[in-house]
């Protein structure tokens, strides 16, 4: 796509498509999220999310960056899902994975560019503070976040300590 965007400068429009929102499709909820495949075939959601994560890691991440250890990157994505709705502390994320803070920054950038996460800056009257204060981290799709933290059914979701953060993330992604 890089070559195309350079040669078509000024003559092409690029759109970022996110999973369906609640307004766009009535079946969207915290557990399923908004990916059309999961909404239409909820009985294969677990298989679909596993395949999505695998192909995302093998194809998309490798196309964007030369990540040496995809196993650690996969653990990083799972750790982020468990921190959904939290203030982003790169040091606290880097330490248990045994990677550096600059590596975490690079990996966050990859997830953000590929449309997996959003970082929501805090609101302050002072615009400068908005830019430097710690953002909150959310996954674009709550169904994917549920899958990554091991929530597979409604009962687990109802009992999960992540439920509030997942709801907050779903609102942020709308």
Where are each of the predicted segments found?
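Short regulatory helix/loop adjacent to the ATP-binding pocket of P-loop NTPases
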Residues: 1-14
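Conserved AAA+ ATPase "SRH/arginine-finger" region at the nucleotide-binding site
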Residues: 13-24, 42-43
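Accessory nucleic acid-recognition modules appended to NTPase machines
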Residues: 43, 47-174
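An amphipathic alpha-helix signature
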Residues: 22-27, 50-54
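Extended, charged alpha-helical "arm/stalk" segments used for dimerization and assembly
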Residues: 29-40, 52
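Hydrophobic/aromatic beta-strand patches that form the interior of the parallel beta-sheet core
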Residues: 13-16, 30, 138
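A residue-level signal for conserved active-site and pocket-lining positions in enzyme catalytic cores
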Residues: 25, 33, 76
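Switch/connector loops and helix/strand junctions flanking conserved nucleotide-binding motifs
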Residues: 1-3, 23-24, 146-147
